[in-house]
Amino acid sequence: MRPSRRAPDELRAVSLERGVVKYAEGSCLVKFGDTHVLVTATLEERLPPWLKGQGRGWVTAEYGMLPRATLERTRREAAAGKQNGRTVEIQRLIGRSLRTIVDLQALGERQITVDCDVLQADGGTRTASITGAWVALADCLAWMKTRNMLKGQVMRDNVAAISCGIYNGTPVLDLDYAEDSEAETDANFVMTGDGRIVEVQGTAEKTPFSQDEFLALMALAQKGVARLVDLQKMAVA
């Protein structure tokens, strides 16, 4: 039995609320159960120096957690003077995931920065961030389209992410913190709307996992991502 009493293939309650920030070109408040992330997408008429003059744009991401997003206060990274390795890893993952489904040529010579700020963390902050980031980016591109700023279709597909793991010997979908902290194996899957794999991160926490167990986790992830993609489409409809 899962601590949340969910079925093995059951997502937490997921919501994707578009257009929640007044000033941002795109935004989304994403909730995976008790994990809540505020995502904004900001259009900037500038590019990294190494991209100038190439006729294409860029999508990048930043990620952070509020001090009391966790059970005990976490010191702000700005106060520490540097980002920790986990933060850097996650924001690079978010940026990579979004760029796989964006036509950077169609975007033109401009940059969209996606900021993911974790308001409350209960497991799966990176997967919630990626899923909400797609909605915020779509919201930003819709804003640009109404102003005739785009050459063509920028978004090629959806992209979403979900965690899976082996908990008490059973493959389960969408781990919360209670499960994640006790799981024998946990993995994050980033996939496109048509089911292609963008990235897989998997770790055996206690004992190695078999190929069959990995395939069982991937099957759960495919089911979960398909549901998330449906919710994304509803959010931007």
From Swiss-Prot:
InterPro entries: ExoRNase_PH_dom1, ExoRNase_PH_dom2, ExoRNase_PH_dom2_sf, PNPase/RNase_PH_dom_sf, Ribosomal_Su5_D2-typ_SF, RNase_PH, RNase_PH_bac-type, RNase_PH_CS. It catalyses: tRNA(n+1) + phosphate = tRNA(n) + a ribonucleoside 5'-diphosphate. Keywords: Nucleotidyltransferase, RNA-binding, rRNA processing, Transferase, tRNA processing, tRNA-binding. One of its GO terms (molecular function) is tRNA binding. Phosphate binds at residues 86, 124-126. It comes from the Bacteria. Phosphorolytic 3'-5' exoribonuclease that plays an important role in tRNA 3'-end maturation. Removes nucleotide residues following the 3'-CCA terminus of tRNAs; can also add nucleotides to the ends of RNA molecules by using nucleoside diphosphates as substrates, but this may not be physiologically important. Probably plays a role in initiation of 16S rRNA degradation (leading to ribosome degradation) during starvation. Homohexameric ring arranged as a trimer of dimers. NCBIfam families: RNasePH. This is Ribonuclease PH. The lineage of its organism: Bacteria, Pseudomonadati, Pseudomonadota, Alphaproteobacteria, Hyphomicrobiales. The gene is rph.
